[in-house]
Amino acid sequence: MANAASGMAVHDDCKLKFLELKAKRTYRFIIYKIEEKQKEVVVEKLGEPTESYEDFTAGLPADECRYAVYDFDFMTKENHQKSRIFFIAWSPDTARVRSKMIYASSKDRFKRELDGIQVELQATDPTEMGLDVFRSRAGGIEC
């Protein structure tokens, strides 16, 4: 088990599932949560490759923080298909202050455990992580 700087442990499954997403494209997305009592980051939800962006956003609670990884497919201006792995720090305004602080203090260390993140987004509401934001940050147009 890896250890985040805030004293948060990172469950081995977090890294294993990320490697499967990155290398084998087994998942479209992964949502992670911090189990405060166990002081550990764990996998909360795995999105199948066929699941959509809407399925992903529906998995993020409106009033609780989460970390997420999303494998975003897009077309470049030269008409080449590409993908980018996004790391999303979801911290809605309505989340508890303590939760926001725990997620913020653990984020960088947790992100370092996931080798291969290409783009990072921080969002406090859904408009900050819309498909248009993903497209512009990835440098292409959506597939």
From Swiss-Prot:
UniProt organism field:
Petunia hybrida (Petunia)
Origin superkingdom: Eukaryota
Q: Which family does it belong to?
A: Belongs to the actin-binding proteins ADF family.
Which InterPro entries does the record associate with it?
Answer: ADF-H, ADF-H/Gelsolin-like_dom_sf, ADF/Cofilin
Q: Which CDD domains match?
A: ADF_cofilin_like
Name-wise, this protein is Actin-depolymerizing factor 2
Q: Does the keyword Membrane apply?
A: no
What this chain does, per the record?
Answer: Actin-depolymerizing protein. Severs actin filaments (F-actin) and binds to actin monomers.
Quote the Pfam families the UniProt record gives: Cofilin_ADF
Q: Which UniProt keywords apply?
A: Actin-binding
GO MF term list: actin binding
Any one GO CC term of this protein is: actin cytoskeleton
Give the UniProt record's GO annotations in the biological process aspect.
Answer: actin filament depolymerization
Disulfide bond sites: none
Fetch the SUPFAM superfamilies from UniProt: Actin depolymerizing proteins (SSF55753)
Q: Where is the ADF-H domain?
A: 5-139
